[in-house]
Amino acid sequence: MKKFKKLIIACDGESASGKSTAARLISKKYRLILLNSGLLYRYASKLLIKNKPRDPISFLNSKFKKVTYRNISNQNLHSQQISDHVALLAKNKEIRKIVNNFQKKIIKDNKKICVEGRDIASKILAKKPKYDIAFYFKCNLDVASYRRWIDIKKKVSLNDVKKSLRKRTAMDRTRKFSPLIKVKDAILIQTDKLNKKQVLSKMCKHIDKIN
């Protein structure tokens, strides 16, 4: 395994495509800070669902100034209610700005980091600092739905999970601000055809080629 003094990795992909697991594994392998942008939007959704503020933007702006990423990452943010809500929230330009600013502060302070989300290579790490390598994750809808269904401990029907994932990906791809896209130089990882070990191995082969 090659050692790096600086390494910035962008991991983008569809819902339940395995990007979070892959980002976690690769971060551990290369001793990188892991930043999951999806958790930030889920945290925002949880706050809005729970508090129902009159002015959501000011409310979230205040909350994100006080919270740490560690605190957010330790919360349970994967309920189906949050999953259904977060796609709508992620379309809001002002909310995206709040989340993006939070991410950029963390990225600025870390030379070795893996950032995972939906607009990382195309927006967050598109320039200064730009990613050293980008990955894009895809997964067959049936496989992705089953994996998410297991993750949420079968609390809703498999069919409902499938509908939710299909809707979320469609919304991510067609939203006006920072839509989900694969940048030209991103390496495609089709996770339904690979196990965790194979995904990690494939990523490592590409990372170790970086000069």
Protein language model features and the residues they cover:
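ATP-binding Walker
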Residues: 14-17
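Post-Walker A helix-loop "phosphate-sensing" segment adjacent to the P-loop in P-loop NTPases
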Residues: 27-37, 50-53
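ATP-dependent small-molecule kinase phosphotransfer cores
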Residues: 39-113, 119, 124, 142-146, ...
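Hydrophobic anchor at the beta1->P-loop junction of P-loop NTPases
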Residues: 9-11
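NTP-dependent small-molecule kinase module
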Residues: 2-4, 77, 101, 146-154, ...
